[in-house]
Each structure stands twice: as C-alpha cells, then as structure tokens.
C-alpha cells in the first residue's frame, strides 16, 4: 500500500510528482551516477533488463520499496532494450549541481523516448495517420536522418507505403481502428492521441515554418498539415530540448518508381529471406557500401527502383566507369572507409547530444568529403558531374573544430581536456595555475620576502584555513599594512592578502573552472556548427549517392556482372542469368536463359519440387529489379524493358497471423495483381491454386492465364505443378511451356536445374519424397498407388473428351458435366471487376454446387 505524500522521503515525493505526469512511461530517475527505477517500473526493469532488484526505505516506518538501476553513462544500451520491447521511457534528470543544491536536487523530465523517437540507436521512423474518405494522409518523420515526408494513399496501399518507410511507431486519433494487418505484419507500436493534438500540431507546424499553408512546400491539400503537424508536435513534445533539427516537409513522390508492394518485397527476398533471415537477402548479398548513408541509399533504391530509362542509364554509366577504372574505385573506397554517418551526426549535433569526439569525427569526415570531391573532378560520367553540383564548402566547420578541439578529446564533454591551448586566454591561465600551483606560490612567496625584507616569511596551507602567510614574532614589526591577521600562534602569526586569496581561489577551483569554461566554449562551438549543418546534410546526400554507385561497381567488378541494356520496348531477354543470392551459397550454379516477347509473354514452368522452378522465376524478377536501380547483373547479356511494376505471388507469409486461409490469401494477392498489372508489368506467380483442391487449382490457374493473355498482356512467369496448365500452349495467345530438366538414374533422379522448352514429363513426386528420406515402405506404397492411378489414366487420351464419351449416360458423366459447369462459371468470372466480398460469395456458391454433386452421387 502506497504511503501518503507526508510519509514519503522528499526524494520519493519528487519521484511521484513526475511519475504522475508520465504514467504510461517507465521513469528513469537520476540519482547521482545512476538512473533508478522504482515500484512497478523496478519489477519491469528487473525482468526485461536482467537487473538485480533491491529496495530502499520509503520514508517513516519499516516499509521498503523495490528499486533497480543502471549507470547513467551506459544508459542508452538499456533504454534501447526497453524501447525495442515496446516501452516508453521518460528521463528524469538532475538539472542542478547536487553540491550546490539547497535541499532536494532539482529534477525535470528532459525527454521521453518512444520506439519512433529513439534516434541515437535506430533509423526507424515515426508515422502519423489521418483518415479522410477512402484515403490516408501520412506524416513521416525520421529524426535519426532528418527525413520529413507527407503522403496520400488509398487504404489498400497504406501497408506497402509504411513497409518501405521502416516505421517503428504510428500515431493515430484515439479510438480510430487501424487496418488489422498494420500492427500484426509491421509489428509497430501504436500511440493514440486526442484529435486536438492533430489540430494543434497543424497550427504549430505552419507557425514554426512561417507559412500560411503547406502548399508552399508542394503539398496539394491543406489536410496534409494534420498528420505532418502531429508527428512534428509529438517529436518536439517528447524530445523537448533534445529535438534534432527537423527539415521542412517534402511530398513523398512515387510516380517515378517501379511499383513494388510488400508482397514483392517479401517474395523476391529483398531485405530478408522467406524464413526471415537477413543474412541471405538480396540487400545483404549485394551490399558493398561503406557508409551508413550509402547503405540507406542502397536499401531505398532496392525498394523504389527507377522507372526512368534516362535515370537508370546515368547510374549505369557511373558504375561502368568505376568498374573499368579500378584505381579510381579503390581510391573512393579508401576515402569512404571510416567516414562517419553524416546524416546521423547532423541529428545528434542539432539535438545537443553530440560528444566532442563526434565533432572530431565530423571534422575528419568532412575532410574526406573534400578528398572525394576532388577525386570526382577527374571522372567523366555525367552522374558524377551532377553529384559534384551538390557538394558544399565546409572549410569553415573544419577549421573551427580543428582550432577549438584537441584531436583526441574525452568521450564526455564535462570531463575537461577537450579545448586546445590558445583558444581562450583565461582557460590557458587556469590550466597553468592548476599545473603550476607550487611554482605560483613560491614565486609569490619570493615576491613578499623582497617587498617586506622578511627572509623567514613562508606560505603554508591547511584544510581549515587554506593558504596563509606565516611570520615569526621577531619580524612582526616589518609586516605591511595590507597583511590581514588570520591566526596567532605562540611563536608566529599567520596572515593573508587579497592577492593570496585570489591565488588560493584560482588554485583550489581551477579544475572546476576549467571544466565549466571548456563546456561553455564547447557549446559555443556546437552552436556555430549547427548554423552550418544544412551544408553537412547536402554533402551527406552527395556522399550517399557516390557510395551507392561505387557499391554497385565493386560487386560488378568482383562478380564480373554484365551491364543490361535498358529499353522502352516490350521484350525481356536474359542470357545465362543467375540468381545473385543463391549463387553466393551454391557451388556450380547453373545459369538459364529467358526470353519474354510478344509471341511468348506467359511462360508456364513445370517440373518436380526442388528442380528449381521457384528459384528461376524469382531470379528473373531479381535481375529485372537490379537492372532498374542501375546495377549490373549476373548474366552474360541482358535486354531489360522498363517496367512499371513487379508483382509476385509467392508463399502465404505473415497473413496466417491474421486468420486468413492460405487459399483466400492467394486469391486476394492474385486479385491485386490482376486489378493493377499492365502490359508494362512483370508478374511472378509461384504455385497458384495449391491451397485448394486439384480441380479448383487447375480451373483458377487456367482462368488467370487466360485473363492475363487477353486483358493485360503482362510479361508473366507461372511455376506450377499442374501439368494440365501446359495444355494452354497453342490455344491461348502468348503461352509457352518450359520445364526444369531432370535426369533419371538407376538410383532415382538427378536435378539438372536447366530450363528447357516443353512441358515436364511427370512430376517425380515419389522420387523427391525418397530423396527427402521418407521410409522405404511409404515410398513403395506410394509407387503402388501411383501405378494403379496411371493404369486408369492411360485409358484416357484426353481426360475431358474421353470421360464425356465413356460416361455419357452414366451417373459419373452427369457429375462431370456439373464439374464442367463449375469450371465454365469460374472461367467466366471477371476477376478484374470482382471485389473480395463478391469473390467470397462466388466461392460459397461454387462450394454449394460441389456439395450438392457429392450428395447426389452418394459420395
């Protein structure tokens, strides 16, 4: 039971005052060299951080309260763990020197750290959502790298946008229901705010940026100010005096990028594998960047590839020049190596959180930036000329830091020893006093002996009196009038002078004064640097682009990748293409060719499981994606058309967490593709229809192929285990059959991973099962059943016509007609104009027909 305020110690009363202001936060309460957690917060801290739980008296009586703590100098690592687990953390700091405090030390909550605002340890961002009609207006703020964007998307596009922006926290109006998949798929922290917060934020952002409307920044509607204002106000409210420099907001533009939704990002394993492993992702395998900003630029380009041939080719020219000019590439990499993350430094410096060492890192990195600029002057590719125009002169910052700070300053600003000699005359004097106190005293003693003629005069010190002048009794008659008596002893008297008192004060307080003065000089330096940070930000962006290009050049050189020809036409040709990720981990990778053109733009790929169907179709998608960021690709030669979108249907992914069946998810994903793909899109479909019965799967797959052929003309790769789909070649425009070659051996089968024209001869499922290690008796039983089925199947040349003739007058024939009626109905569905709800109703009707047929037959 909590004590009343009167019974608590003054410190705990102060704690309760702040805890009541921030009840939804863990309150880190500064006590000396530790941040302490009390009460329930202590239990949470002990559990989540593995801290030892202790206790202290609550006040009068014997009651004790639980507590645990972390050292203040290493608090960030503990805070990171708490924030990553979804907690908000309020920092209650001592705001006065405890040695000078009268009574309880003054404290204030100086900052609230949330998942979207912990910019020291993460580059994740903060998003605010404002729903209006069928659209969401999105405000996005990344404090770590100074990115402030506004977007407007349809409800169904929201997940794709937020997944690209790397959101850690979402702000919504209290009581507003979010799309269910946002929290579950993105796994983000949601903070609910009163509607007034959005309105106040809207007013605040306009006022602070000095505009009447955000249309001044390119936003077409005033509604953008609500979500943008909310993230802006939230950042300032939580970060208080530590708020980094927030740039003016920019509209998020996606018109110039290839459409890449969250399904394609997952399906092509761009950032992580289907199993969730980041170490075998496309990004990880091709990343040769050397700076934090370059790494983020590469990731951004992979998620937002260019849709402009001109932009792609400009990047390609830069990559080619560096690939061929090995000396220049090595010099660039040497310059970039060890360069600080300038974007992150801008945020830390502007938030008053940068250490002296980080300012030195900034200075050294800006020197490297100048080296890089001079090197780029020697290169010929137009892209480097463009980048050069973005560099800004930062010599003023470099010189200022160099003249002010020592080369290897301490980690913490208040430790002293960070300002160079000659910067401040008084500081130099204090240091001399500190380092030469004894010399100062002996010189003053000598001076006094000369002035008074008292040769036995001496200066001494004790803790009670401090410094004093001692004169023996025989010499008291020579003591000058400016000597002030302090103490009388039996054989001598002790005096002081104004000059000795000044000297004493200087000596005893020199180190404290040194530290305080150095801190003030450091703050002045930091303020001067802050005024120049826009230049640093522009240079950071230029460096990021160079790092991105050199990374592509480095891997192209390492792997001997080829430059794809980019064109505005239709055909997609890849000769001896290889999957860059699989090739990294598999020896003797087998390359394959691809040719999608007007005559064959739907490739149906068959073959047994493990033969390489899925890897091949993803390979084509990955190589197309790489081509659109300006990268060279693992192929002998390639001709890649500019595409407007990359669609994939691969695996069921995270939707299982939403309670959606595999089959329903397949249909929703395919529906999205059929409703949005165009002739300029590339579509990757892997095993569509596997989540339902064989007949359903075949019927739906055929209907999809027909729709793509007749309505979309999109270049499509369809991997399937339904051999019946191969019947469409020659019947439907654009369909061409391919299969993954398999070699039969006495021991079973051997996968060759070679793509060949024509359909697969059988599925080899039992052989694959044997390779997987199924018990021999299971394999033999499966072979026996398969032979029986094949004997029945061999009696039919074409399943549908022969069944019609054989069972025309039988009950089985009637059932076949009913199934054909169902198939016909499926083929007649206009998927492009069918909503998910309509699809469910149609499925329900078809299921009812199937159930009726079974009852009629007595099945």
Swiss-Prot record:
Organism whose genome encodes this protein: Aquifex aeolicus (strain VF5)
Name assigned to this protein: DNA mismatch repair protein MutS
Name the GO terms of the biological process aspect. mismatch repair
Keywords, A to Z, come to: ATP-binding, DNA damage, DNA repair, DNA-binding, Nucleotide-binding
Entry's Gene Ontology molecular function annotations: ATP binding; ATP-dependent DNA damage sensor activity; damaged DNA binding; mismatched DNA binding
Function text: This protein is involved in the repair of mismatches in DNA. It is possible that it carries out the mismatch recognition step. This protein has a weak ATPase activity.
Keyword check for ATP-binding, yes or no: yes
What does the entry list as the binding residues for ATP?
607-614
What are the GO cellular component annotations? cytosol
Q: Sorted alphabetically, which SMART domains does this protein's record hold?
A: MUTSac (SM00534), MUTSd (SM00533)
